[in-house]
């Protein structure tokens, strides 16, 4: 189909073929009162050059902000080569057709991605991505219930991202699945082991285990994993992939390892970009692979013995099983996965470890400086990765607003999600922050607190 505007002759020919005299006549059935006529607030058209200039002017109004917000989406340095490669025509505009084997390059890249994510999580198999971390967790909950067969209850700690918990409830509630929340320890910020004991001998399909949790605190993942599996429940890990460069992978948690690992892939080379698009990842142990949603790429050989890549285990998918499929997800976030694969390949294991280690070191240094401010305290005693919760001596909303006026995004106000914490803020410092950035933040925060 050529993308060429209709000429006046084309329009008259089409009107004549349907017996209409004008375009307006096609809309005669709409009452005049419902017709707006011209849109008064729509400005006249601009040339390409004028639009470019206008967009630059609008962008300059935003300015540059120093960002200390994390909470599930993190500002990491992305090598220029990542998106230079990802936006090549072979990747950027390609699509895996229903005869997927015709796209060997795309399939090979997705296969490499799966290999990297399986290695990073310590699991047996990975799929080719999910929409985002929250929906990946919801799919993991559905997967656990299908595999468990006797229980339709999921335990989710309150230390899991509140938006993730909301998404899980929204997706599973119409399938007769109950979501039960586990309280957190008010001192450590970790999932309360005493809270788990209160469930007695009740049966659950799975326990969700965040690492690190929403507060930035590292959980006792070995104990939680063993607790779940000792009760014949699945252990679902929700992990930050950047943290896995330093921490024990889910596949090695406890005595047997977690059963399913999911998370948000944004830290792996995806820009913040106003909230998306991102991608979710999912990996699992081999016995659960037939319950895993999403595309899975396999490696095989053709009739001549050459290596090739295929979509495998397709009987799980909606284009084969329709309503009986594990999920209606299909190609989804392929371009984001392409960028993540390039990012992981460029950094390699050592580069990923350096990035994670610098993020951890920056957050530790920032917390040390913040705690020297009068009235600023760490809320939880548990160890952290690269973000933590601090309490402020002034209303958190007004403090953050004052910092924003100074072009500093000072953290996430937790009052909406955890009102019991009072004026608490979740702060994050990745490897992108210099000592000068952190010193500036602490200085400005101190001035705001003193002047409030």
From Swiss-Prot:
UniProt EC number: 1.4.4.2
One of the record's GO molecular function terms: glycine dehydrogenase (decarboxylating) activity
InterPro entries registered for this protein in UniProt: GcvPA (IPR023010), GDC-P_N (IPR049315), GDC_P (IPR020581), PyrdxlP-dep_Trfase (IPR015424), PyrdxlP-dep_Trfase_major (IPR015421), PyrdxlP-dep_Trfase_small (IPR015422)
Enzyme class (EC, first level): oxidoreductase
Domain of life: Bacteria
Keyword Chloroplast attached: no
Keyword field: Oxidoreductase
Reaction equation(s) it catalyzes: N(6)-[(R)-lipoyl]-L-lysyl-[glycine-cleavage complex H protein] + glycine + H(+) = N(6)-[(R)-S(8)-aminomethyldihydrolipoyl]-L-lysyl-[glycine-cleavage complex H protein] + CO2
A Pfam family per the record: GDC-P
GO biological process: one example: glycine decarboxylation via glycine cleavage system
PANTHER family the UniProt entry points to: GLYCINE CLEAVAGE SYSTEM P-PROTEIN, GLYCINE DEHYDROGENASE (DECARBOXYLATING)
Binding partners and assembly: The glycine cleavage system is composed of four proteins: P, T, L and H. In this organism, the P 'protein' is a heterodimer of two subunits.
Family recorded in the similarity comment: Belongs to the GcvP family. N-terminal subunit subfamily.
Biological role: The glycine cleavage system catalyzes the degradation of glycine. The P protein binds the alpha-amino group of glycine through its pyridoxal phosphate cofactor; CO(2) is released and the remaining methylamine moiety is then transferred to the lipoamide cofactor of the H protein.
Protein name: Probable glycine dehydrogenase (decarboxylating) subunit 1
Lineage of source species: Bacteria, Pseudomonadati, Pseudomonadota, Betaproteobacteria, Nitrosomonadales
């Amino acid at each position: 189909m050529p993308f060429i505007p209709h000429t006046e002759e084309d329009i008259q020919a089409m009107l004549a073929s349907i017996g209409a005299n004008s375009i307006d006549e096609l809309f005669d059935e709409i009452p005049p009162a419902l017709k707006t006529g011209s849109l008064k607030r729509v400005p006249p058209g601009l040339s390409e050059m004028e639009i470019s200039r206008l967009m630059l002017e609008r962008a300059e109004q935003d300015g540059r902000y120093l960002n200390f917000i994390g909470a599930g989406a993190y500002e990491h340095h992305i090598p220029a080569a990542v998106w230079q490669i990802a936006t090549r025509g072979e990747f950027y505009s390609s699509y895996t057709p229903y005869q997927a084997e015709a796209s060997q390059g795309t399939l090979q890249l997705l296969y490499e991605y799966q290999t990297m994510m399986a290695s990073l999580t310590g699991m047996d198999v990975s799929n080719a991505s999910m929409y985002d971390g929250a929906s990946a967790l919801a799919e993991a909950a559905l997967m656990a219930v299908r595999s468990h067969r006797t229980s339709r209850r999921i335990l989710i700690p309150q230390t899991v991202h509140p938006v993730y918990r909301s998404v899980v409830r929204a997706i599973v509630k119409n399938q007769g699945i109950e979501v039960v929340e586990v309280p957190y320890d008010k001192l450590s910020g970790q999932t309360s082991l005493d809270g788990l004991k209160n469930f007695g001998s009740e049966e659950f399909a799975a326990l969700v285990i965040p690492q690190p949790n929403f507060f930035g605190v590292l959980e006792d993942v070995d104990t939680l994993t063993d607790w779940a599996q000792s009760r014949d429940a699945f252990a679902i890990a929700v992990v930050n992939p950047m943290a896995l460069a330093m921490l024990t992978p889910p596949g090695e948690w406890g005595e047997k390892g977690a059963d399913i690992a999911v998370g948000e892939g944004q830290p792996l080379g995806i820009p913040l970009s106003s909230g998306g698009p991102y991608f979710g990842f999912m990996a699992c142990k081999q016995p659960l692979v037939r319950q895993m949603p999403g595309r899975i790429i396999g490696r095989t050989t053709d009739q001549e013995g050459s290596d090739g890549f295929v979509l495998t285990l397709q009987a799980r998918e909606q284009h084969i099983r329709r309503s009986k499929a594990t999920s209606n997800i299909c190609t989804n976030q392929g371009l984001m996965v392409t960028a993540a694969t390039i990012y992981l390949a460029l950094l390699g294991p050592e580069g990923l470890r350096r990035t994670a280690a610098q993020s951890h070191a920056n957050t530790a240094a920032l917390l040390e400086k913040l705690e020297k401010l009068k009235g600023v305290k760490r809320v939880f005693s548990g160890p952290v990765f690269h973000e933590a919760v601090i309490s402020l001596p002034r209303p958190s909303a007004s403090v953050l607003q004052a910092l924003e006026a100074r072009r500093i995004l000072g953290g996430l106000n937790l009052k909406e999600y955890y009102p019991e914490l009072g004026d608490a803020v979740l702060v994050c410092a990745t490897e992108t922050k210099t000592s000068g950035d952190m010193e500036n933040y602490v200085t400005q925060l101190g001035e705001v607190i003193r002047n409030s």
